[in-house]
Amino acid sequence: MLTDLIIELQQTLGILHKQDIQLASRQGQQRLIGDGEAIRLGDDCAAIPDENGYLLLAAEGMAPSLITQDPWFAGWCSVLVNVSDIYAMGGRPIAVVDALWSKSSDQAQQIWAGMQAASARFNVPIVGGHTNTHSGYDALGVAILGRAKSLITSFDAQVGDRLILVSNFQGKPRPNAPYCWDAATMAETETLQKHWDLLPYLAENKLCDAGKDVSMGGIIGTALMLLETSKCGAILDLDAISCPAGLDFRQWLLSFPSYGFLLSVRPQFVKTVKACFQAEGLIAEAIATIQPGHNLTLKLGSESQLFWDLQQNPLTGFTGDS
């Protein structure tokens, strides 16, 4: 059973498409800004030091298939995924801008409606961008600015840390996008804000060594990216991962969960970190242990097999080098 699951996961596009990022990583692992400060590349956001902590800058593009099948939800997700990037690094969002190309005003309006709904729900204004409704195709990209007092990076997982998976089971698969678990469109702003605020709380109280939001690479793909940038390995116990009722386990492993994070936490802080999320009705489970090396090993029942060797087969190519 584990062998079949590994073969399926290794071939999923959500993971394989992350290798496209190697086009960027081959250009270097850091960039210098005006004052000579080095910005490490490969995190959820670029973290730019300023006098009050860090400015956070990120951008996301929407899959063309999602824009075609569910334009409102594509607009919604374009804001959601950017907001998630900011909170994943311990920050708070300030504003977003967008770049929208569409074949018609009607299509653009549906996308805009989703973006505006998410903007209102997450209290993050859309403050500018680019719009073209005479394009030969539909495309959407959104960028976000945020600020953090303290960071949760994906560069600093430590050997011996426990990897905690955080998720929200109060949702359902989106009808036109079954690998998108929708835990946000029906939730109240106040509830969502309480959930988001837990991440900067962890950062500011130094309760987390590293972290990353769960992306379209799913739980396993996100774990790989975190291990790669931290230059670590891990043993991940699939039996430790709970699944929402009525959802196939393999589907859950590959889903974008709306609200989902992998947090690398020192053993003495695991109980505290889990309690923070569980107090808000969220799921927080220790699913892996950070190991020396460069291998992600999956465990299921009494079976244990190598899933990925990041030294032999890089994923994004970003290794957190400064």
UniProtKB/Swiss-Prot annotation:
InterPro entries per the UniProt record, alphabetical: AIR_synthase-rel_sll0787, PurM-like_C_dom, PurM-like_C_sf, PurM-like_N, PurM-like_N_sf, ThiL-like, UCP036540_AIR
Signal peptide location: none
A Gene Ontology biological process term: thiamine biosynthetic process
An example Gene Ontology molecular-function term: thiamine-phosphate kinase activity
Any Pfam family the entry gives: AIRS
Family: To M.jannaschii MJ0640 and MJ0799.
PANTHER family: THIAMINE-MONOPHOSPHATE KINASE
Protein name: Uncharacterized protein sll0787
Organism expressing this protein natively: Synechocystis sp. (strain ATCC 27184 / PCC 6803 / Kazusa)
